[in-house]
């Protein structure tokens, strides 16, 4: 989860509010372009913020290997599969997946296929531009990097080394 503590001692959670505060404080570094492109960036950022989160929750809690990895790191000890049942969040995961439309195996496969497909498109784009939408960063890059850094590259599954 993205967290930002401000000089006023506010703690902001979630990428979208964090980006909005940063834009207000550092307008020269704005991640939301002006005019029509800014509208598109805002819409894509908002959609990806919710869509990527649901896929990440699926990966984390439908794959015991991922749950074991994150709960071992969080507890500071090497857990066994049988230990997972002791963690309330382990039981929360499947409920969250049901609420976000990744409960059924067919929904899980569809979400994974969409996510991997999006990453492949992004990789192709980044072969010709520095950032997802061109040669300067936008809020879309922040959203994409958040899911990649916090989950995809940190958890055992999916394995993007292929």
Predicted regions and their residues:
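GST-like fold's C-terminal all-alpha helical module
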Residues: 54-162
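GST-like domain detector, emphasizing the conserved glutathione-binding G-site
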Residues: 1-82, 132
């Amino acid at each position: 989860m993205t967290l930002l503590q401000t000089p006023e001692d506010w703690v902001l959670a979630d990428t979208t509010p964090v980006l909005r505060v940063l834009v207000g404080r550092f307008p020269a570094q704005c991640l939301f372009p002006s005019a029509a492109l800014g509208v598109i960036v805002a819409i894509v950022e908002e959609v990806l913020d919710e869509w990527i989160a649901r896929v990440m929750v699926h990966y984390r809690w439908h794959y015991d290997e991922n749950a074991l990895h994150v709960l071992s790191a969080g507890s500071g000890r090497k857990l066994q599969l049988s230990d997972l049942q002791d963690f309330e969040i382990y039981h929360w995961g499947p409920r969250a997946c049901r609420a976000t439309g990744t409960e059924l195996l067919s929904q899980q496969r569809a979400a994974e296929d969409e996510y991997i497909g999006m990453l492949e498109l992004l990789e192709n784009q980044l072969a010709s531009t520095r950032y997802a939408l061109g040669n300067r960063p936008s809020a879309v890059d922040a959203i994409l990097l958040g899911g990649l850094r916090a989950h995809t590259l940190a958890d055992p599954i999916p394995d993007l080394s292929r």
